Amino acid sequence: MSSSSPLQRQIMRICQLHAWYGDLLAQSEIQPHACEISELPLMTSALLEKHYYAQQARQEAGLSVFKTSGTSTGVRKAIYYSEEDDEKYIAAKAESFREWLAATDSAGPNCRPAVIKKALADMGTGHAASTALTIFKQLGWQAESLSFELPIEQHIAKLEAFRPELLYTMPSILDAIVSASGEPHLLGIQKIILVGEIAPPEWQSNIAARFGIEPQDILDTYGSIEIGAIAAYSHELGQYVIDSGIHAEALPAELIDERFEPLQANEAVLVLTSYVRTLFPAIRYVTYDVVRDFRTVTINGKERQCFSCIAKRIGTDLKHGEKISLYDIESVVHQFVHDAELRVKLIQNKLSVHIRSKSLKDEMLVHIQHAIEHKIGDIGLMIQNRILEGISVTRAAENEQLERGAVKSKKIYF
């Protein structure tokens, strides 16, 4: 390995900013100047708990600090961004959005050029939300934001009053907007950027139709508070393309933790090394997200890593629910109804899929149940092995309030 390789430079920088990481390498007799990435320790949740999250509060000038949601452990943890981290994130996102808009404007006869003058950020808390207005202003747009905690009627009122051409939001918020507005195509939204939750292609196509736009007018992005921007969905490739400043690995689950059961042949746990992040030790960071069809492709003469979807997330508590892919369930349901908003529960080994949809007919419920059981291999196998007692698919009343998470609502409820 060259002494000036990006990996070696990043290792040395992380050792300078996180002294414990250098100690960790020394204990394992790993030479930062002469090691392969596969020799470096996996940055697991246990390692971060011991060293990063337990550290004294950092005091450097210009710091931004964000707290995790704490949904998995009940404890909110501090994650730091330096001014450099923020600047690189904002520049990368602005360029990504600019390239996407240019590409969709010239994608074909069905894609009319969009003139973006106003953009609205309507999402949860965290790094993506805090930087959205800065990114929009760099792109020359009039920008405003809205708290996700407000009643949905206020979201609709804001959209009607501000009339943004571009909406930056979360899929569950978009579901609620579509359900409450009745005629979302009248809101004048021409482009949608998504963050924070799963958005299967079937769902994206149905949402695009409701707004009177094309699927290519939706950009689904994948990121995390630890890493920042990770990937964005390419409708042309049908793949999530990983950011050029990141090196990704797709590892077997049992290599991460011997308690994890093997995944399906085309699935692996995503592990990331960022060459731009500094105040988080993003070297072989284990996301615990399970991706499918990980591969390397050539785009515009450059090799890029990509995957087809995030199927699910695994963790050390080993719930049966970790074998269940919300992505797959959403994909199946949206093959039957175009306006479905759903909540999935796993209670006492019974899987419940509760659907709110104006187009859903009662006779469809049994067909959706059959499709979930027979098209999603893991669920069918769990029922066959009596790990799951069965599936119930029910419809929600039109005015029924669906469960909402503290930030994310697209998840499996236990």
What are these regions (language model features)?
Residues 7-10, 14, 113-114, 118-119, ...:
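Generic low-polarity alpha-helical segments
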Residues 20-30, 53-67, 81-89, 131-148, ...:
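Short, charge-rich amphipathic segments
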Residues 45-206, 210:
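Active-site phosphate/ATP/adenylate-binding loop shared across adenylate-forming ligases
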Residues 2-6, 10, 142, 147-414:
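Active-site glycine/GP-rich loop and adjacent strand/helix microenvironment
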